[in-house]
Swiss-Prot record:
One of the record's GO cellular component terms: plasma membrane
Stretches assigned to the GS domain: 171-200
GO MF entry, a single one: SMAD binding
Residues spanning the membrane: 120-140
Residues annotated as domain Protein kinase: 201-502
Keywords, comma-separated and alphabetical: Angiogenesis, ATP-binding, Cell membrane, Disulfide bond, Glycoprotein, Kinase, Magnesium, Manganese, Membrane, Metal-binding, Nucleotide-binding, Phosphoprotein, Receptor, Serine/threonine-protein kinase, Signal, Transferase, Transmembrane, Transmembrane helix
Major location (coarse): membrane
Protein name: Activin receptor type-1-like
Signal sequence segment: 1-22
Glycosylation sites: N32, N97
Its membrane topology: Single-pass type I membrane protein
UniProt binding sites for ATP: V207, G208, K209, G210, R211, Y212, G213, E214, V215, K228
Originating organism: Mus musculus (Mouse)
Amino acid sequence: MTLGSFRRGLLMLSVAFGLTRGDLAKPSKLVNCTCESPHCKRPFCQGSWCTVVLVREQGRHPQVYRGCGSLNQELCLGRPTEFLNHHCCYRSFCNHNVSLMLEATQTPSEEPEVDAHLPLILGPVLALPVLVALGALGLWRVRRRQEKQRDLHSDLGESSLILKASEQADSMLGDFLDSDCTTGSGSGLPFLVQRTVARQVALVECVGKGRYGEVWRGSWHGESVAVKIFSSRDEQSWFRETEIYNTVLLRHDNILGFIASDMTSRNSSTQLWLITHYHEHGSLYDFLQRQTLEPQLALRLAVSAACGLAHLHVEIFGTQGKPAIAHRDLKSRNVLVKSNLQCCIADLGLAVMHSQSSDYLDIGNNPRVGTKRYMAPEVLDEHIRTDCFESYKWTDIWAFGLVLWEIARRTIINGIVEDYRPPFYDMVPNDPSFEDMKKVVCVDQQTPTIPNRLAADPVLSGLAQMMRECWYPNPSARLTALRIKKTLQKLSHNPEKPKVIH
């Protein structure tokens, strides 16, 4: 037994049993990495570093695997051999475009001989871990075989649905998303189809920019889609939003429709794309600056937004269920207006999930904070209970009350309407600091002034009362999203079709 072959055996064993995947240790600082291997459940993963492994098994072509590592960092220091090359890097997605090579095949005489007693010494030491690993591998293969059998039926269904969509000239995207061709969550396309769609999207025009990056209108087989391109500093938001859309049942008329998520290389840099339905009216913030509203349209916008928030907040049980979700960055810029003049909620990059069955609160790993202008008093004075999911829902309700106020200002009553203004426009600067908002909301206990003219309309007076109940200083006294939804639906009893007043 030679030293080279002994080292190869240990390295191959480590790779074969996934010891660099980071499943056994909690990394202190996480990076996002491309994940391409049989055990990848998503096209990305998180770990302490990114890995690329090039392996050549006897009689086969070399195989490339990409993933994450959180332990066994000594493998990163190994030199390449004719069978294995293992590369580690420490920036997000640094393993996306790395190419490796194997050493030229060596003759046995080139490898130094190892002490003949070494196998006798190491044999008993290695026997137990090897047996345990082999048992684990056997169990994994059995489960993998069962999963493949289950997936076979869904894959066949997906293929037929994709062909059907290709044959129909109108609304290919609709055929994809309205069918059962999903990841199983009902939230988007299968991962391989997501990647295919992303590579077929052509960017047409930039329709928005912000601290997160840019939003483009794209074209896919003649249909418009929205492409949100995240900046490198906001990659955790992309990761979180992709994670939620791919694991949670979020198909709802009043939640922005998800299509695909992918990493692409443009101009020698990695771009993070989130592809969603395109809504030409843009955000509610943009819509309210351009349009004034009749009372019925104002209620239509409010009811639909409340329906989306209620769907996020509720936990649905069963095989097609979903955990409860709190948005944490609700504002008029993160609410879109659809062509039917209903709202849908977007941007889940800060969302928090909670499951009652496991009592697990999934906060994510995003250092970004919400928008200061829409922060609830308990967030500003740092008294929020971060270990309690209800606390996050209560902050959403505070912010939703501010969105209702923005809608109410642009509603025409007796021929009177105000210009669009953001909440607290007359109390804080255009870009308020944390301290600015804390003084106004917590110290002075101010809330936006509700227009007196709302009292002249029996329906909108109910909307005004709802705002006040969203802004109670005591978070637990605020309305729930479900109560807001039901109350608004009662107020909106008039079936007259809404109109936009220019």
